[in-house]
Amino acid sequence: LRVGVLVTGIHYRHPAVLANMASALDIISGGRLELGIGAGWNEEESGAYGIELGSIKERFDRFEESCQVLKGLLTQDTTTFDGRYYQLKDARNEPKGPQQPHPPICIGGSGEKRTLKITARYADHWNFVGGPPEEFARKRDVLAAHCADIGRDPKEIMLSSHLRLGAERDYAKVVADAAALGAEGLDLAIVYLPQPYDPSVLEPLAKAVRDSGLLTS
């Protein structure tokens, strides 16, 4: 059983604070943290909290700097960074968590110019926000091209997608959707449950998945 969020907007916290929180949670959970991050999108929530979201360009410029800072603090003894949004000098993050070289970093989103490019460089896990298999396959290929540009094997990155169990509780549809995405290289299907999150759906959903033969481990 893993622990994490899918995903936290990076603008809510300084990446140094987030790195320390991540290390602490990785320790407390016994090395089960999945660090899910994104550039941020929720204008209503950001406005309610009085946190500046910024333009799309600003969000992604800040996000890319954040990824560099996070990776440094999670893997290095000290980190020095001089960016537009963040400046660190001989910064430490100790103790680090048990997962080495760092907890898996998951980046969510499908933007081809910035999100997938940043994913190729910094992520261990990419989350596709959901859509038909053809769209997933196209985004997968864009991600692979970005990986090729920097000499990275795209197989190093886990591929996941959202699936939704509707109020009608059509378990067979969830399984069919997962199978269609699996044929295009999906590694992990993440099922969103209908509100009010009735736990009684879990057993029939698990049975449908188990009976489908889709489980690999």
Residue ranges and their predicted role:
Residues L1-S217:
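Active-site-adjacent structural elements that line small-molecule/cofactor binding pockets in enzymes
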